Amino acid sequence: HIGLHRLPPLLRAFTRAYPQVSLDIRFLDSEVAYDEVLHGRAELAVITLAPQTAEPVRAMKVWDDPLDFVVAPEHPLAGKADIRLADVAGHPAVFPGGNTFTHHIAQRLFEREGLTPNITMSTNYMETIKMMVSIGIAWSVLPRSMLDEQVVSLPLPGIQLTRQLGYIVHRERTLSNAARAFMALLDAERGD
C-alpha cells in the first residue's frame, strides 16, 4: 500500500535530486521490513508502524492513515443508517493477515467491544482486500486513501480507526548519506 500510494512522489523527488544514487528498494510486508531493520539487513524502512516499537528500533510517524469500514455497494449494510459494530461483526470479513499491524489495530477494536469479527479469509495485500470487498464477498477495513466507487464506507458513529505510517531505523547503525537524504524527504512530509 505505501509503495503504491505514498512513496512514488518521494522516490521521484529523490531520484531527481540524486540521480547518481543507485537505490536498493525492496517491497516487503511492514512486519518483515521491521525485522530486516532490527537485524541490520536494511538501514531504513517505510512501513505501517507497530503500536509499540522496541529498542534499538526508532520509529518516526510521517502520516496518519485513517481506516474505514467498507462494503460493496450492493452489500446488505450499504446505505443503512445507525450501523453498530455488532452489525458488522455478524457479516463475513476479509482481514489483513493475522501477523500484520493493521490486523491487530482492527482486532483490538472488536475485542474492546467484546465482539469477534467473522473473518472468513485474509491476505496481506490491501489491493486484494479491496477487490474481495468490491465483488461482495466480505466487508473489511481499508485505508481511506484507497476508497473509490468500487466500495462504500460504512458510517459507524463514535468509531474511528487510524494507523500510523512512517519510517524506522536502527538506533545503533550508522546510516548512509542516501538513507539520511531520504529521511530528510520523509521528515519534510511530516512537517519537520
Question: Which role does the model predict for each range below?
Answer:
Residues 15, 51, 58-61, 77, ...:
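Short secondary-structure boundary/capping segments
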Residues 48, 78, 91-113, 175-184, ...:
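Secondary-structure junction motif
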Residues 29-42, 48, 99-152:
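Hydrophobic hinge/microswitch elements
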Residues 155-192:
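A late-sequence structural motif
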Residues 54-67, 71-93, 177-179:
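Flexible hinge/capping segments at coil-to-helix
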Residues 1-54, 119-123:
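Central regulatory/effector-binding core of bacterial HTH transcription factors
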Residues 58-68, 139-144, 151-165:
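Short beta-strand->loop
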Residues 49-50, 73, 143-146, 165, ...:
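Short secondary-structure boundary segments
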